[in-house]
Amino acid sequence: MDTWTGAEARLLRKVALRMTVREFATELGISPRTVSKWEQAGSSRQPRPHFQAMFDTLLDRADTAAHRRFAQALANRDSGDSGVDRRVFNKTLIGISTLALPAWAHTTSATPAGMNVDKVHVQTLRAAADWIRQRDQHVGGGVLLHQAADCLTRAKAMLETATYTPEVGTALMSATGDLALCAGWVAYDADREDLARQWYSDALALASEAGDDDLAVHALQNASLLAMSPTGTGSPSRAMQLTERSRIIARNIRSSRLHALIAARSAIAHAAMGDRPNFERAIGTAWREVEHAEGHELPADTAIWLQFVVPAEVRYHEARGRAYLGDLDAAAAIYHAGAEAQPDPRNATNYRAALASTLADAGDTSTAIAEGVTVLGSLEENVSSWRTLRRLEPVREAAANHRGGEEFHVRFDNLKAMNGGAA
């Protein structure tokens, strides 16, 4: 599930697991009264993140029949606006499972021998990738990881075991590579950089096989960002290498948003290596390209994965680069403006986490803690992004020895514990 509410918890308990309220409460280690409150509130109430994770675990452990019952119940449900979004995804996922694997099978078992795959299958995979990207902007990757991985498993099974024409096969490779990128991104946001690195490599290999330059550039750009991750094991040199390769491949692709992204990623790699002149040159290019895109490229003509490349994204890269170069006050000012302007909850939370971390590095501990508390509130309620939590590590370190920092470090440590101690 992307986000569990009382309505989904009730379906999990009653339809999928076939438990009584008391049995379900015992499994979760809570009182039956709490379960009843969730279910009575329905879709208007979201249990806290650690319960969301417990629901995911219960569903993961359930047998195939229980998964099938749960998926069908979601698809048949006829409720409010957020339910519509969930039904779209679950119908898509059921479509994938019907076309490829037994419903909700969590294995790499093969598709039926001799099964034919056509354009409908490819369109279904594309729809799943688009849905994951749209939901990620609102809730973060933590709660989408299971679904993205499940879709990717099914797509790979289709690719490896089904029968299709050469034309459909090429399209299927591209669609599977796109799902690998989606899965890699939500893994990155969930602080599973090992999975992200694996799935980005899968995407790049599929792009090469399919001759899909757009997919190759996308995979290289995501891998570059992973190499530059503040929590990663990569390096600015590796990020620059990947970015330069993507720039070469993208020379004949007409998209100012794409060229803005490549320039912005190049800028932060230069900044991380202390190269101010090349940072200024690259970030200037990014601004020119994104401003051209804003005036000349219609949203309808922009690939969905590039729609996030707007001035706010370039602003984020500029702030990050200036922080690398030691211009902490300038970076903090840019992050603050970006956080206020971001409409998507996940992105706004990530901006504010970067702001808090920068303020802590600059020695403004009180303001860093205040911003950090706001971020923790989002992570506790409606955004699941362990990557964002880890961005707050400098604030946690500063709060440990600061008067008034106790609330922050207690809440931070509680969230960290929910993620198995990783943050």
Question: Which residues does each predicted region cover?
Answer:
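Generic non-transmembrane alpha-helix signal with a bias for helix starts/N-cap capping motifs
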Residues: G6-A7, R18, Y200, Y316
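Short glycine-/small-residue-rich flexible loop motifs, especially phosphate/cofactor-binding loops
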Residues: R10-L11, R22, L204, R247
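Short N-terminal micro-motifs specific to bacterial/archaeal maturation
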Residues: V15, A25-T26, G80, N116, ...
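Short coil turns linking two alpha-helices in DNA-binding domains
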Residues: T20, S31-T34
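Intrinsically disordered, low-complexity regions enriched in Ser/Pro/Gly/Gln/His and often acidic
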Residues: I30-S31, D178
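Conserved binding/catalytic microenvironments
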Residues: A113-A423
